């Protein structure tokens, strides 16, 4: 429930959390020679982290397991530190290639476990990377863009605290908002004249035709402005152009409002 994102003076970025830590055990069913740790596989192979499991995919973004492996492949270097089960595991990559492998034998197979560099009572994962300047023409991180996105994530993941630090400018922001999407609407309407004090909020869950469960949250509050501000997210990922969920909401609201107008003969009064 605590995440720290730091932009360092060399324009590298580190992300530290206090979660369970990426699994570090060697995957004996790995086809690679030597057999690698689960963490190395997740950071070097596309689709290795795919979340084809309803519980895993309920909240988190991504699906096909390409995110962190792409970051690794597009970085000049990436350093992975995992604190798990009382040990500090470490592995370094350069342009996606593991460096200074640990090698051992197990059950007649060559294995490459993560290096253990210390003991600890803490837990969590730290990813520290520097974008590759030979691939990107601009590797400067914009504080405002990161700040806006991390604020969104703080609202969308109620109870999670996210801290953003910029060592280049000695700036820091703490995002620890409560209230979820309802609190997000309240934040967006700050300083605006709202037409109703209470924020409309609804949540529900329904099984799809494929048998998976889909949960939905909606929060709305009208203000006296002339333009609308509609934000849509699926598993924390913003949909700039909306989607079928927004289309369905608009259709349902139009139907309900028209019915209310007809039932109360408001159109005739107008």
Residue ranges and their predicted role:
Residues 42:
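Short basic (Lys/Arg) and small-residue
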Residues 6-8, 59-65, 201-203, 265-270:
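Glycine/charge-rich, flexible interdomain linkers and switch-proximal surface loops
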Residues 2, 9-38, 49-187:
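GHKL-type ATPase core
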Residues 45-46:
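Mobile ATP-lid/nucleotide-binding loop of the nucleotide-binding subdomain
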Residues 108-116, 144, 151-153, 159, ...:
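GHKL/Histidine-kinase-like ATPase module
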